[in-house]
UniProtKB/Swiss-Prot annotation:
Modified-residue entries (N-acetylmethionine), positions: 1
Stated name of the protein: Small ribosomal subunit protein eS7y
Keyword terms, alphabetized: Acetylation, Coiled coil, Ribonucleoprotein, Ribosomal protein
Short name of one Pfam family: Ribosomal_S7e
Gene this protein is translated from: RPS7B
Taxonomic path: Eukaryota, Viridiplantae, Streptophyta, Embryophyta, Tracheophyta
Protein species of origin: Arabidopsis thaliana (Mouse-ear cress)
Length: 191
């Protein structure tokens, strides 16, 4: 009995793609077979899943989760990513919360747009989602002579073991999602 359909909630009238069905089936199987994840996964669902080709022959699975369920997914993030990466062998799994960007209000309009709906705010929040579970401890923006920008993001070195293997994937996913160049690094700690 396939009942993974309640693991994905898309906009009305939009059917899930074949890849999204694979992801929801994997989540459904995890819920039924893995006892420690069963209770946490019971009420969780996703909005969308996309497979991205990153530089070289690497692939990434980007799973969009509802903004309201972001905290619940973060509680089980490490275990869930480990299990999903086993199922999708050779692909890095990244969870990103679904957020909306509102266009700036027209001149003379009295409508205020919330800060969390601005392009800058959404891109910063996506950066945090992509880098999770590592915490961002610093950012530097470097302007080259030709006018291009590169953002250096310093990650907390406590979780270096959990994130170091997918730094390249995180860079590629962030570039595809936002169009901005970013470099992830761990700050050198002087003893």
């Amino acid at each position: 009995m396939y009942s993974g359909q309640n693991k994905i909630h898309k906009d009305k009238g939009v059917a899930p793609t074949e890849f999204e069905e694979q992801v929801t089936q994997a989540l459904f199987d995890l819920e039924n077979t893995n006892q420690e994840l069963k209770s946490e996964l019971k009420d969780l669902y996703i909005n969308q899943a996309v497979q991205m080709d990153i530089s070289g022959n690497r692939k990434a699975v980007v799973i969009y989760v509802p903004f309201r369920l972001r905290k619940a997914f973060r509680k089980i993030h490490l275990r869930l990513v480990r299990e999903l990466e086993k199922k999708f062998s050779g692909k890095d799994v990244i969870f990103v919360a679904t957020r909306r960007i509102m266009r700036p209000p027209k001149k003379g309009s009295a409508v205020q747009r919330p800060r969390n709906r601005t392009l800058t705010s959404v891109h910063e929040a996506m950066l945090e989602d992509v880098a999770y579970p590592a915490e961002i401890v610093g950012k530097r923006t470097r302007y080259r002579l030709d006018g291009t920008k590169i953002m250096k993001v310093f990650l907390d070195s406590k979780l270096k073991n959990d994130t170091e293997y997918k730094l390249e994937t995180m860079v590629g996913v962030y570039r595809k999602l936002t169009g901005k160049d970013v470099v992830f690094e761990y700050p050198v700690i002087e003893a």
